Amino acid sequence: MDYGFATRAIHAGQDPESVTGAVIVPIYQTSTYAQRGVGDHTGYEYSRTDNPTRTALQTCLAALEEAKHALVFASGLGASTTLMLMLKAGDHVICGDDVYGGTYRLFQRVMTEHGLSFDFIDMADPEAVRAAIKPNTRLIWLETPTNPLLKLAPIAAITRVAREHGIWTIVDNTFASPYNQRPITLGADMVLHSTTKYIGGHSDVVGGAIMTSNDELYEKLKFLQNAAGAVPGPFDCWLVLRGVKTLSIRMRDDERNALAIAQFLTEHPGVEKVIYPGLPSHPQHNLAREQMRGFGGMISILLKGGAEAANAMVSKTKL
């Protein structure tokens, strides 16, 4: 049976526990597992490799992104770093020019020291992406909408270009959440999330995730998840499972509030510009309507008066 998004968020990977019938996934707070004999385990042997609470979360997140597989990590950057370990010295990556600051730092300050090269371009035009491809390009890294300027990238068009050249694509879907956008259905090879943000939703846990429907990529990433070890503990996984149950409700309310605030700020005399994909004034509003279910809850604004006005606004903000 095909369940709706909200039902999958509550139930996918979360069947009642077989011994007690508990309807909430237990926190399997263990590092090791008893084996039936030498080399004969029941599916779990060491919690860096696998843990039942983590398995439940991975199953749930894969269902939400309509992917075959998901892997979770100790942070979004832990997921990003693990993914980059699939590349080798001399490989080239194309990335958006408004990528999340932590990702930019990882690429420019860390990965370049290990022989990778990067070009940061405007992802709005698929032909610009095509023009940036080199013989050694191995990965196209999309973030849409971007943090913080809410630029969009046409996922389906760019993934078509990537497939023509045998290049992997990954979409950082953190700002949209799987409720509003599912890049794998648009052709992406992989999707990345900081589960710290919308998926966890309660500001009480740090985590990351990668989803894919490509079996080969999954096996590579699963090996690296275990080998590099940037895995979340079972309590962190449980917190994300708890938070994701209300994702659909939170996203609907968040978008409704964001649109009302964006429309209000558009008319405010102290505001020079409001950037929100849900406004017709956003240069990629039509693309947002095409590839997103909703516009999300993130807004960027440019104030008249520059940094001084921005500092004054932040210092006076009450909520």
Swiss-Prot record:
PROSITE patterns: CYS_MET_METAB_PP
Family label: Belongs to the trans-sulfuration enzymes family.
This protein's name: Probable cystathionine gamma-synthase
N6-(pyridoxal phosphate)lysine: modified positions: K197
Keyword list, A-Z: Amino-acid biosynthesis, Cytoplasm, Methionine biosynthesis, Pyridoxal phosphate, Transferase
Cysteine pairs bridged by disulfides in the record: none
Gene: metB
Catalysis: reaction(s): O-succinyl-L-homoserine + L-cysteine = L,L-cystathionine + succinate + H(+)
Enzyme class label: transferase
Keyword tRNA processing belongs to the record: no
